[in-house]
Amino acid sequence: MRRKTVLDFAKGRGPYVWITAYDYPTAKAVDEAGVDGILVGDSLGMVLLGLPNTLGVTMEDMVRHTEAVARAKPRALVVADMPFMSYETGPEDALKNAARLIRAGADAVKLEGGAEYAHIVERLVKAGIPVMGHIGLTPQRVLTIGGFRMVGKTEEQRRKVLEDAKALRDAGAFSIVLEFVPASLAREVTQAVDIPTICIGSGPHCDGQILVLHDVIGLSERPPSFAKRYADVAAAIREAVSKYAEEVRKGLFPAREHYRE
């Protein structure tokens, strides 16, 4: 089966299934499960590195993990997050950093922010780099927005989210992530733009959904309220390692079939 490209993500062809992955084995597993898109998210800072937010994630982190995901040769589209301060300093810095992620194996990049970064999106798209937008709750702005809170409760916020979506569309983004906005606002945005919207914590009215893998499989310590756990991998790990430890301490492992004289 051929690999997906951004041209496969068109309005009306969904719902599209997206999930995060950060390394070779998880990328291989989620791709075999049949997802449409894989996001190498800067959320790796929180779910892999134990950071309190995504601000400490570097370009080096993103390049390394994008390379690992790309080695799985997924059929799904691979999008890599542009981390904090990798594009805010201007179009040329953004272009250089986005190019690093494309060379690492990403098919596109994602950046947070709306109309204020439309010129960045336009510069990347003109250079041949597909861009996914990200509006609503933008975790890289956590220090200025007062935490991980729903966006779009006031009329001013709703108007801003809608304007941001249209600005990103006009700048050439191929898709937009809507994070933690009211479902009614997500529906309004989805109806207002002719590119796919991908919801996370924003209800059922988008063109697709995305979740963090570790929330889905039960490896997150504090998953958000909008996530659903489909497995308890943490419990499976504890059980397996406990059995291993018990067998080592009882002299049952390694057994004869596990070594050579």
Curated annotation (Swiss-Prot):
NCBIfam families: panB, PRK00311.1. Its main location: cytoplasm. The active site is at 179 (proton acceptor). This is 3-methyl-2-oxobutanoate hydroxymethyltransferase. It comes from Pyrobaculum islandicum (strain DSM 4184 / JCM 9189 / GEO3). 3-methyl-2-oxobutanoate binds at residues 42-43, 81, 110. InterPro entries: Pantoate_hydroxy_MeTrfase, Pyrv/PenolPyrv_kinase-like_dom, Pyrv_kinase-like_dom_sf. Its cofactor is Mg(2+). Keywords: Coenzyme A biosynthesis, Cytoplasm, Magnesium, Metal-binding, Transferase. Gene3D superfamilies: Phosphoenolpyruvate-binding domains. The lineage of its organism: Archaea, Thermoproteota, Thermoprotei, Thermoproteales, Thermoproteaceae. Binds 1 Mg(2+) ion per subunit. Catalyzes the reversible reaction in which hydroxymethyl group from 5,10-methylenetetrahydrofolate is transferred onto alpha-ketoisovalerate to form ketopantoate. It comes from the Archaea.
